[in-house]
């Protein structure tokens, strides 16, 4: 009886450990990425002087932390945690958006709709290169007058 209880306890611990591991570790964008301004194209938009994106797999989902310097040279930081399931999550620290709606497409691709006051304002499509060394984020948006704008930000894996 004691042996069965002991074996059952070990199996329960093993199963709990396996199930508590983040299911997001296979997402190739998980890791740290540094903006490569030389390879990026921001059009006429003001450009961040520096930016680092850190995607971390957690039990609650993938946590994205963005840190850097804005075009005026002031520090900036924003973050959200999402299961990348297409559901809105709070995005703190982003002056352009208060909600993110990231949706996983596959291990190398996801799409994120930025929202402000409930209205979609920007769509970002992220693609990790086949060699997993480059993250390219293509953003499209419309200004208040409805004119389209866009940018392509290229990040190198750190």
Question: What is the predicted function of each stretch?
Answer:
Residues 1-10:
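Bacterial N-terminal signal peptides that target proteins for export
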Residues 15-22:
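C-terminal segment of classical bacterial N-terminal signal peptides
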Residues 22-158:
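Hydrophobic small-molecule pocket/channel-lining residues, especially in calycin-type beta-barrels
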